[in-house]
């Protein structure tokens, strides 16, 4: 009995001991499960945070690369300036025809898009593109053209170039020459009109008659007035007398409707807030035109018109007509200058007066002494002017106002001026050359007219070069503003806008 009780007691204790052991094991397993869930939750939060950081970094990288790529693409677009325009005229403009027949600003947009695509490509083919950027579309939202505001942007680049090259002080000297011309009235003093008025007075005067006896008996005849100045004055307007011997005149001609001033031009936004040129910049632009354009005395190689400066001044369609108009202008100015000198020279006035006195007395009309004297002075001034212009055309120099030393013809020798040969050294002496005289007239020319004609000349000469047959200045861009739509294969779209220009 005692043994059975002990066994039962022992069994109960063993059962109780087993229960406690199983409980501890169960609690231990529950603790392990709680830790695992906690770690998973922490890892999920950390992973989300890491992914958020990675995505933020990706967005920043996309933004940075987009901005850099856009800036590079815009600069690359400006790098496609027309090479001939730079080489011949030192001007930076994008020719939106890109050597093709049809020009369009859309071509520039496509070029920018192409540069964006190149900039977005991975530099290493083995590397993974973590940004996935694609240039979906590029639009040009604003642009300025060379022809805008009557060539304001072309003039601005030209003036900046000249200021960098020479400064601005040199242009002031030319202004002094123009002031002297205006002060003395060389642009307005019409010697031909003086000669015409004097000749009309002579022609309207009733010459006396004289009694003549011959084999038929006595009869009355009109007294003849033999004025030696008539032979010189009769040659006025004969341009061939001015041209140097054996001169070959250019026969080149253009169709004005083929160039900028003869068509309706495309328009852009112009200066668009950029600093406009001042009135003091106009002489600088004149010097640019003179530097980049040829003329009769100093021609430019490979030009459509051989006498470009003459065309800019007169706008006629042929070299011959422009040269004639220029020679007429130069004769007018030189004749005025020479007439003023003769009238101010006591010695030469006295010579003309003595000759006029003898002519009028021979005609029994002493009242005509003064008008005859004026015709002699006008003829003398004209003969000297023909010599002057002939020398200028051959590359020589003539002072604006002559003195005794620089005066060429005596009263006797001026009657043979038409057959006079240019034998002296053209490089000798001081004064102004042919281009200097053209400068005077260029300074007087209306700014809009001369700018348009110069732009015509630019188009003429650039079109002569390979790949520029359809070149047009109103299709040449100085500044652009572009907007690009960028997408990412990771699900984001971006829009970026940039502007860039050659001139500020």
Label every model-predicted segment.
Residues 1-2, 376:
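Short intrinsically disordered, low-complexity coil segments enriched in acidic
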Residues 3-104:
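Alpha-helical assembly-interface signal, strongest on the long, hydrophobic N-terminal helix that forms
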Residues 83, 91-504:
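Long, compositionally biased low-complexity segments
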């Amino acid at each position: 009995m005692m043994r059975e009780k002990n066994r039962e007691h022992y069994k109960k204790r063993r059962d109780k001991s087993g229960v406690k052991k199983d409980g501890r094991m169960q609690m231990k397993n529950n603790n392990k499960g709680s830790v695992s869930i906690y770690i998973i939750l922490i890892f999920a939060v950390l992973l989300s945070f890491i992914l958020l950081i990675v995505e933020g970094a990706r967005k920043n990288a996309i933004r940075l690369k987009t901005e850099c790529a856009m800036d590079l693409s815009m600069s690359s677009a400006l790098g496609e300036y027309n090479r001939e325009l730079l080489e011949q005229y030192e001007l930076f403009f994008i020719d939106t025809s890109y050597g093709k027949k049809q020009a369009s600003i859309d071509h520039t947009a496509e070029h920018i898009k192409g540069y964006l695509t190149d900039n977005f490509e991975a530099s290493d083919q083995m590397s993974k593109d973590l940004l996935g950027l694609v240039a979906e579309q590029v639009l040009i939202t604003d642009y300025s053209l060379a022809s805008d505001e009557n060539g304001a942007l072309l003039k601005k680049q030209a003036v900046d170039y000249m200021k960098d090259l020479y400064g601005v002080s040199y242009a002031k000297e030319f202004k002094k020459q123009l002031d002297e011309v205006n002060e003395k009235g060389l642009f307005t003093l019409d010697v031909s009109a003086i000669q015409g008025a004097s000749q009309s007075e002579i022609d309207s005067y009733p010459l006396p008659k004289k009694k003549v006896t011959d084999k038929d008996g006595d009869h009355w005849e009109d007294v003849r007035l033999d004025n030696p100045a008539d032979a010189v004055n009769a040659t006025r307007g004969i341009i061939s007398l001015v041209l140097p011997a054996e001169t070959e005149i250019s026969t080149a001609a253009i169709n004005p409707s083929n160039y900028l001033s003869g068509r309706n031009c495309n328009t852009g936004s112009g200066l668009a807030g950029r600093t406009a040129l001042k009135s003091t910049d106009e002489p600088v632009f004149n010097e640019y035109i003179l530097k980049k354009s040829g003329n009769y005395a100093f021609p430019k190689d490979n030009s459509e018109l051989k006498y470009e400066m003459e065309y800019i001044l007169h706008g006629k369609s042929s070299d011959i007509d422009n040269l004639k108009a220029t020679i007429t202008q130069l004769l007018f100015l030189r004749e005025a200058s020479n007439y003023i000198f003769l009238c101010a020279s006591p010695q030469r006035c006295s010579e003309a007066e003595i000759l006029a006195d003898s002519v009028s007395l021979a005609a029994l009309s002493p009242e005509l002494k003064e008008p005859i004297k004026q015709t002699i002075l006008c003829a003398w001034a004209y003969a000297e002017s023909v010599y002057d212009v002939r020398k200028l055309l051959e590359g020589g120099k003539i002072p604006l106002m002559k003195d005794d030393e620089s005066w060429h013809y005596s009263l006797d020798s001026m009657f043979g001026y038409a057959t006079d040969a240019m034998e002296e050294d053209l490089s000798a002496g001081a004064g102004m050359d042919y281009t200097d005289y053209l400068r005077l007239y260029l300074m007087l020319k209306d700014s809009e007219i001369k700018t348009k004609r110069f732009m015509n000349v630019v188009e003429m000469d650039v079109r002569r070069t390979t790949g520029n047959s359809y070149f047009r200045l109103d299709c040449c861009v100085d500044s652009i503003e572009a907007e690009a739509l960028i997408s990412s294969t990771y699900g984001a779209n971006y829009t970026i806008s940039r502007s860039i220009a050659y001139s500020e």
